[in-house]
């Protein structure tokens, strides 16, 4: 969640940044009104508690002197009832504030360009030149069906739309891609973690998926358990230290994690209906870092380089895009997307998103560290795909396709097959 004390002293600046993130103009005002109400209620409770303490001392002194404390006893009883009532008022004010604050997105960094949507994202640089073909390149779904790698019809038969069956050499290549990504990320100092695919509500709250994006999540709900399927292993890797206080010496934490991801893709009707670009179930290899606040910018650059170098090692042309304010995710203060060239579509498509969430997720998940002076401080959290597995398979198929419809295997993957 956002820092309410900081917002209070920089209202106009932060309100402008939230509006740039397509948040309604009155949201921040409503949030601060609820915050002021809570502070007022807490002050009233504190005053009543102080009065109770003072009166209790007076009562004790009178009793020691064996005096008449009848009236004072009545006052203490009345004030105790007031404290109970005021405590309930404070609790209700806290719930009201949390409900509002939990749906307010992170504040954008100063260097994030203002813009309405993805059309106003800014290209930072392009890496490698797209391949030139002496024939009309095909899209991955046409190549995959012809080779017997991708079976969309049976994927639909098994699970419905936006599910794909991968088989034969396609499945082997998919597995090779995963193992290569994990090895590459480990070579950059990221520790491999294997984490659950089902999580509790509070874990999704920690990374910002709940409560705002509940409709895009799959839930397993029965008599035995009530858990959500993860939309990304960012959720589990970031929350690994949920509610904990780390020592400064433990930072930075650098995780890489492979997982299946599950998303309803609400609002994407009609988009990418053919092929593997947009699926309800897909695979990713994720990077997650937990750092001191002063180190997160350097870590952000390191994570962007890791994912970009991974694409480069596969010989895949791509570009780095700075997301504008209107295209940023809920928890992100800053994001760079990596978009890979797909010759079959004759365009660049997102294959990785690297985000710095500052202390936004840490505040929600209560992840802190104890600094050298013994003070507990919030960490910064960062996450990014390195890479989306299915889209990497798509990119290899389209970029390495031959005139006869066969697919050449990138050299770095040969030992993994």
From Swiss-Prot:
Subcellular location: Cytoplasm
Primary location group: cytoplasm
Enzyme class: ligase
Positions with a binding annotation for L-serine: 232-234, 286, 385
Matches recorded under Gene3D superfamilies: Bira Bifunctional Protein, Domain 2, Serine-tRNA synthetase, tRNA binding domain
GO CC terms, sorted: cytoplasm
Pathway: Aminoacyl-tRNA biosynthesis; selenocysteinyl-tRNA(Sec) biosynthesis; L-seryl-tRNA(Sec) from L-serine and tRNA(Sec): step 1/1
Cross-referenced PANTHER family: SERINE--TRNA LIGASE, SERYL-TRNA SYNTHETASE
Protein family according to the UniProt entry: Belongs to the class-II aminoacyl-tRNA synthetase family. Type-1 seryl-tRNA synthetase subfamily.
Comment, domains: Consists of two distinct domains, a catalytic core and a N-terminal extension that is involved in tRNA binding.
Subunit structure: Homodimer. The tRNA molecule binds across the dimer.
NCBIfam families to which the protein is assigned, alphabetical: serS (TIGR00414)
Protein name according to UniProt: Serine--tRNA ligase
Naturally occurring in which organism (per UniProt): Campylobacter hominis (strain ATCC BAA-381 / DSM 21671 / CCUG 45161 / LMG 19568 / NCTC 13146 / CH001A)
Lineage: Bacteria, Pseudomonadati, Campylobacterota, Epsilonproteobacteria, Campylobacterales
């Amino acid at each position: 969640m956002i820092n309410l004390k900081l917002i209070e002293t920089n209202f106009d600046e932060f309100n402008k940044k939230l509006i740039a993130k397509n948040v309604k103009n009155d949201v921040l005002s409503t949030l601060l009104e609820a915050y002021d109400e809570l502070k007022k209620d807490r002050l009233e409770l504190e005053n009543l508690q102080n009065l109770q303490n003072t009166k209790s001392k007076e009562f004790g002194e009178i009793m020691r002197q064996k005096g008449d404390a009848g009236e004072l006893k009545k006052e203490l009883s009345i004030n105790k009832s007031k404290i109970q009532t005021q405590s309930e008022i404070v609790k209700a004010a806290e719930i009201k504030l949390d409900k509002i604050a939990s749906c307010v997105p992170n504040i954008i960094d100063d260097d994030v360009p203002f813009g309405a949507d993805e059309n106003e994202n800014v290209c930072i640089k392009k890496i490698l030149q797209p391949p030139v073909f002496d024939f009309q390149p095909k899209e991955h779904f046409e190549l995959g069906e012809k080779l017997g790698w991708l079976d969309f019809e049976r994927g639909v038969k098994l699970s419905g739309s936006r599910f794909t069956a991968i088989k034969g050499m396609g499945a082997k290549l998919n597995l090779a891609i995963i193992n290569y990504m994990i090895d590459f990320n480990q070579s950059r100092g990221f520790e491999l973690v294997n984490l659950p695919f089902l999580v509790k509500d509070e874990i999704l709250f920690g990374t910002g998926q709940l409560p705002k994006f509940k409709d895009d999540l799959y839930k397993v709900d029965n008599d035995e358990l009530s858990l959500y399927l993860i939309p990304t292993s960012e959720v589990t890797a970031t929350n690994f230290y949920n509610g904990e206080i780390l020592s400064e010496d433990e930072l930075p934490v650098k995780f890489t994690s492979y997982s299946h991801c599950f998303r309803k893709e609400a609002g994407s009707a009609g988009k990418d209906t053919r092929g593997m670009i947009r699926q309800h179930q897909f695979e990713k290899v994720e990077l997650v870092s937990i750092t001191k606040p002063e180190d997160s910018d350097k870590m952000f650059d390191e994570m962007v380089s890791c994912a970009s170098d991974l694409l480069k090692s596969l010989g895949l042309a791509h570009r780095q895009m700075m997301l504008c304010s209107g295209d940023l995710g809920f928890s992100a203060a800053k994001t760079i997307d990596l978009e890979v060239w797909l010759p079959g579509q004759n365009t660049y498509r997102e294959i990785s998103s690297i985000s710095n969430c500052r202390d936004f997720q840490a505040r929600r998940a209560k992840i802190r560290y104890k600094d050298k002076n013994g003070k507990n401080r919030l960490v910064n959290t960062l996450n990014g795909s390195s890479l989306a597995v299915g889209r990497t398979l798509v990119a290899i198929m389209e970029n390495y396709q031959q005139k006869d419809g066969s697919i050449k295997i990138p050299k770095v993957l040969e030992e993994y097959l």
